[in-house]
């Protein structure tokens, strides 16, 4: 078993199977592209368990991903994919960077979901880019761009239904996709309160990493409550 990659939140290892990788979730939390960073016991367990439940739910609703199964509290087994260097962001309600960029009021509900692409490049601070930029950078073709948008909107519909069942609002989320050796585009990485903005329906209280970004509560307690809500749906 060889360490293949280590990022801010995860380590990826080879296995004795050519078509399987092991992902280990770390106890680190970051914000502001790593400008703010802490280690919190239990964070890896929570994100792994939440992502495993959500990926299984998405698969049950026709959305394929790299996820195979959960191995332990902090580990999961996944299919190897070549990550497309884009963060695909879907926004249902205005919050975060879009309020500063375009002047929307925080909490303003969009008429329809907005899909944005951000170029995964730490040196450039992950800039927002257009479809034409995506093609110019040879990241994806016209066909792939349409597949990414279509999959992102389908994921949005399924996640909104899931959050609605927990009396929560899906404000926005970011996802990543990868390509298999045969060129199939699969959902990859994770879906957790690290990668979503989630509000309580009644109070608009955060159930996401904004409690850490804005120092408004305990990240571990917030994520545990969210996990409990997910598990209560089983």
From Swiss-Prot:
Signal peptide: none
Alphabetically ordered keywords of this record: ATP-binding, Ligase, Nucleotide-binding, Purine biosynthesis
The UniProt record lists the keyword Signal: no
Key word ATP-binding present: yes
GO MF annotation terms: ATP binding; phosphoribosylaminoimidazolesuccinocarboxamide synthase activity
Stored SUPFAM superfamilies: SAICAR synthase-like (SSF56104)
Listed pathway(s): Purine metabolism; IMP biosynthesis via de novo pathway; 5-amino-1-(5-phospho-D-ribosyl)imidazole-4-carboxamide from 5-amino-1-(5-phospho-D-ribosyl)imidazole-4-carboxylate: step 1/2
EC code: 6.3.2.6
Catalytic activity: 5-amino-1-(5-phospho-D-ribosyl)imidazole-4-carboxylate + L-aspartate + ATP = (2S)-2-[5-amino-1-(5-phospho-beta-D-ribosyl)imidazole-4-carboxamido]succinate + ADP + phosphate + 2 H(+)
Pfam families per UniProt: SAICAR_synt (PF01259)
Enzyme class: ligase
InterPro entries xrefs: SAICAR_synt/ADE2_N (IPR028923), SAICAR_synt_PurC (IPR033934), SAICAR_synth (IPR001636), SAICAR_synthetase (IPR050089), SAICAR_synthetase_CS (IPR018236)
Stored Gene3D superfamilies: ATP-grasp fold, B domain, Phosphorylase Kinase, domain 1
Entry superkingdom: Bacteria
Listed GO biological process terms: 'de novo' IMP biosynthetic process; cobalamin biosynthetic process
NCBIfam families given in the database record: purC
Recorded family membership: Belongs to the SAICAR synthetase family.
Protein name: Phosphoribosylaminoimidazole-succinocarboxamide synthase
Underlying gene: purC
């Amino acid at each position: 078993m060889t360490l293949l990659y280590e990022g801010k939140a995860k380590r990826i290892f080879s296995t004795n199977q050519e078509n399987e990788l092991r992902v280990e979730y770390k106890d680190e939390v970051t914000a502001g592209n790593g400008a703010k960073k802490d280690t919190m016991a239990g964070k890896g367990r929570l994100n792994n368990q939440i992502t495993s439940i959500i990926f299984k739910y998405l698969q049950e609703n026709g959305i394929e991903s790299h996820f195979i199964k959960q191995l332990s509290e902090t580990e999961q087994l996944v299919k190897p994919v070549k990550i497309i260097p884009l963060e695909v962001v879907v926004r249902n309600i205005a919050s975060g960077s879009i309020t500063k960029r375009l002047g929307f009021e925080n909490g303003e509900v969009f008429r329809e979901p907005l899909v944005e692409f951000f170029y995964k490049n730490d040196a450039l601070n992950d800039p927002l880019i257009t479809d034409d930029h995506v093609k110019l950078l040879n990241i994806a073709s016209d066909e792939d761009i349409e597949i990414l948008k279509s999959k992102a909107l389908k994921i949005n519909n399924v996640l909104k239904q899931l959050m609605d069942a927990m009396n929560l609002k899906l404000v926005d989320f970011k996802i990543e996709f990868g390509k298999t050796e045969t060129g199939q585009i699969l959902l990859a990485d994770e879906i957790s309160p690290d990668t979503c903005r989630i509000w309580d329906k009644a109070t608009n209280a955060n159930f996401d990493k904004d409690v850490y970004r804005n120092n408004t509560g305990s990240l571990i307690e917030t994520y545990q409550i969210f996990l409990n809500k997910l598990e209560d749906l089983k």
